[in-house]
Design a protein with these regions (language model features):
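Portal/gating segments that form or line small-molecule/metal binding sites
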Residues: 68
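Basic, Lys/Arg-enriched alpha-helical interface segments
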Residues: 1-65, 74-78, 85-107
Length: 107
């Protein structure tokens, strides 16, 4: 099929482990969808564009809402840059800035 891979930035891996287990399971489900079908075929309610090259995975759980910000890098790879529990309606600017800094560090 699509042959996409989802990788996780080392700092985002620690953030992912810190969110509740049900949200981690949802993250894995969305990552599997992205790998199987590619980012062009997966949309709302699973993923949504943020700005520039950034997209977000949307995870819901018993304890609230979490997001994983990712970008396409080198070929058919998606790199998860930042994972956080969302507390406001809008994605915090600081979360976007963190993801952009991490994206620059891997280029």
């Amino acid at each position: 099929m699509a042959d996409w891979t989802v990788r996780v930035h080392p700092q985002a891996e620690a953030e992912l482990k810190a969110i509740p287990a049900d949200m981690q399971a949802r993250f894995l489900h969305i990552a599997e969808l992205l790998e199987a079908f590619g980012p062009q075929k997966v949309g709302m309610p699973h993923v949504r564009p943020l700005e520039r090259k950034l997209w977000e995975m949307r995870m819901h759980g018993r304890d609230g809402i979490a997001r994983a910000v990712y970008a396409a890098v080198q070929g058919r790879a998606l790199l998860v840059l930042h994972v956080f529990v969302k507390k406001t309606q809008a994605t915090p600017r600081s979360a976007i800035e963190t993801a952009l800094k991490r994206l620059e560090s891997v280029k």
